[in-house]
Amino acid sequence: MSADFAGSGRNWSQRRLTTGDPEILWERSPTHGGRTIYAPRMTRKQRAEHVLQRLEQLYPQTPVPLDHRDPFTLLVAVLLSAQCTDARVNQVTPHLFARAATPQAMAQVPVDEVEAIVRPCGLAPKKARAIVELSKILLQRHQGRVPDDFEALEQLPGVGHKTASVVMAQAFGVPAFPIDTHIHRLAQRWGLTDGRNVQQTERDLKRLFPRQSWNKLHLQIIFYGRDHCTARGCDGTVCPLCRELYPRRRTPVTWRKG
């Protein structure tokens, strides 16, 4: 729905107008030819639908970024990816998995040896201890298998909700929506959440998007952020999606870190 309304003033403004739909926000453009033009602003749901459509066009295929062989090697790779790039993890894991690629083998490797291998990923002492300890727990409690259960995964050393979500989605195909600071930032720029932390953003995105889209969309947002909407390369007014969702936005978006 669109309409023209008379008005005046130089500044952008937003207002709710009686249009039969109380959810429509109308944005006022600068006057043109003596007239002020009002056009409907997208609702949050409409923005979500636009994001889903555009990302499907841009990224119809979503390969898992972390190289792995099975749920265990994926779990280890995701743990190593904390505060580290996927590219760096993929350089390190071939050396680690050549030494031990199963819980049975990893549980026998001295922690300091694992630490030396994973040092390029950062936080090596903490990550090495977690990898060896979780391998032992998998043997003791789960018959040497990675559990396909959120609660059981989050009880493993070094495994938080985001890591568990990635494993559930990418190893077992269970609908999940892993949220890191990058997805949190883009969701704020795109007006999909008012969340002050990643937990709130996860709840908002799960409400907005169909459950069957979560696993793929998680990766599509990551790929788009890397290619077009980086932390420093876009301020909410630069990349194609930001411009499409907010064509009249002129002020950079200050995002709240989760």
Regions found by a protein language model. Give the residues of each.
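Repetitive helical segments and hydrophobic/amphipathic motifs
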Residues: 20-23, 32
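Cationic, amphipathic, low-complexity segments that mediate targeting or membrane/lipid association
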Residues: 2, 27-28
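Short, positively charged and aromatic/hydrophobic N-terminal segments
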Residues: 24-25, 36-38
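Catalytic cores of DNA base-excision repair glycosylases
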Residues: 43-258
